[in-house]
Regions:
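Aromatic/acidic polysaccharide-binding cleft in carbohydrate-active enzymes
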Residues: 20, 32-33, 251-256, 277, ...
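N-terminal structural segment of carbohydrate-active enzymes
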Residues: 1-118, 128, 133-137, 174, ...
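Active-site-proximal helices and loops of the catalytic beta/alpha 8
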Residues: 109-116, 127, 132-143, 194, ...
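Active-site-adjacent "subsite" loops/lids of carbohydrate-active enzymes
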Residues: 129-202, 210-213
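The substrate-binding groove and active-site-proximal loops of carbohydrate-active enzymes
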Residues: 41-56, 88-102, 174-189, 205-215, ...
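Hydrophobic faces of well-ordered beta-strands that scaffold small-molecule active sites
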Residues: 13-15, 73-75, 119-121, 207, ...
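Aromatic- and acidic-residue-enriched segments that line the glycan-binding/catalytic groove
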Residues: 6, 26-38, 84-96, 125-164, ...
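Conserved, mostly hydrophobic/aromatic
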Residues: 17, 65, 75, 92, ...
């Protein structure tokens, strides 16, 4: 079988945006809440607080994003939710009103496409939330609800909030706030497929899939790919899988995964013994122990042999994300480590992804600190920003940086 992946991804430089933290619109008339109790933009973020970033603010920031050389944006979830990260989905067809709703998203999509910037959304299809209408109906009506078989319920009554009693349903990572879908139910599968199709038809350029390894239903992701690609053959499907992903990268499911197998050894090599271990030891990737050059080369060659070359070229390579500490903090503030890591990222086969703010030296410990508000211009690190712009320009200038062979040379 000949593996086919979207050609545009091979030439993309992604920018990952956490929508609540990139920018508040400068046009208050477009905000749903004018007197909202937002957290101070520059204050340290909290687990539950909102800072009030919105899609209008991102539209206003597209010129800056384009000036970096970015031509694709991956958004963490934007759908209606009761959490600042929006992984607790209430409505898969409604962009969160706090972000500007569907109106703002349609305007953002059009504005991004006018600048030749692709848009990839985060699909949280393993689980929903306590506020998801179908689950809420189960809470209200118990065994009589028509949606009972949409979830993995083991007994009655359900206890969605009181931890003194058994939940009696499966929540992702044992979290009662995140009821897991019953993907073996054909109605659930069809519902998710139709969500994916709806937003692709609206014009998005792909899906990043949250914890897709949790969905065990045979053929689920194969059908997902078939139905998405039937609408847009160039749609990008990328999974959040932290380790060996050969199971999903056989050409019938995902075009790539978030390449933490690149991030770990790259940081271990560039930051070495400067890596702040408490920022990485509880994570699902390993930027430690320190690696010497020959050891790093061996790790990278092993990684490049793991998947077909067509897949390597559409991996989503990264150094940090909303699920990790930021590189500046992991490296103990060492700018040389940050710049060397960025050099390796932007010269590696696959699509590089820059986590918003990393290009200006934004620090941040593990969640929630890694989700700070985008810094004021006065606080930007101009040297790191210059490094990013130069390397992105070089990557765009030379095709070999994007699709050429990768060889290790020994001095």
């Amino acid at each position: 079988m000949q593996i086919q992946t979207p050609d545009w991804v091979k030439h993309a430089v992604f920018y990952q945006i956490f929508p609540d933290r990139f920018a508040r619109s400068k046009q208050p008339r477009k905000r749903l809440l004018h007197e909202a109790r937002w957290e101070d933009w520059e204050a340290m973020p909290t687990l539950q607080g909102y800072k009030g970033g919105d899609l209008w603010g991102i539209i206003e920031g597209l010129d800056y994003i384009q000036s970096l050389g970015i031509n694709a944006i991956y958004f963490t979830p934007i759908f209606q939710s009761a959490s600042n990260h929006r992984y607790h989905t209430h409505d898969y067809y409604q962009v969160d009103p706090l972000l500007g709703g569907n109106e703002a998203f349609k305007e953002l999509l059009e504005a991004a496409h006018q600048k030749n910037i692709k848009v990839v959304l985060d699909g949280v299809f393993n689980h929903s939330s306590r506020g998801f209408f179908f689950f809420h109906d189960v809470l209200e009506n118990g065994p009589q609800s028509p949606w009972v078989n949409w979830f993995k319920i083991h007994g009655w009554p359900l206890s969605p909030y009181n931890g003194e009693f058994p939940a009696n349903y499966e929540g992702w990572a044992d979290n009662r706030a995140l009821p897991v879908f019953n993907h073996d139910n054909p109605e659930v599968k069809e519902y998710i497929m139709e969500i994916a199709e709806y937003w692709i038809k609206l014009g998005i350029d792909g899906w990043r899939l949250d914890v897709p390894f949790e969905i065990k239903t045979p053929g689920f992701w194969q059908e997902f790919r078939d139905r998405v690609k039937a609408i847009n053959p160039d749609a990008y499907i990328v999974g959040e899988v932290w380790g060996d992903s050969r199971e999903w990268l056989d050409g019938t499911q995902f075009d790539g995964v978030m390449n933490y197998l690149f991030a770990g050894p790259t940081i271990a090599f560039t930051a070495g013994d400067r890596v702040v271990l408490e920022q990485v030891q509880s994570r699902d990737y390993q930027p430690y122990p320190p690696l010497f050059a020959a050891e790093y080369a061996a790790k990278i060659q092993e990684l490049l042999q793991l998947y077909p070359w067509e897949i390597q070229l559409t991996q989503l390579n990264l150094l940090a994300s909303h699920d990790t500490a930021r590189l500046m903090t992991i490296a103990g503030g060492d700018k040389a480590s940050v710049e060397l890591s960025t050099l390796l990222l932007l010269t590696f086969p696959g699509a590089p992804s820059i986590y918003y703010g990393d290009e200006v030296g934004l620090p941040g410990a593990i969640d929630p600190d890694s989700r700070r508000g985008f810094p004021l211009e006065a606080n930007w690190d101009r040297e790191i920003l210059k490094t990013h712009r130069q390397l992105i320009e070089i990557r765009h200038q030379y095709p070999a940086m994007r699709t050429g062979d990768y060889q290790v040379l020994y001095a």
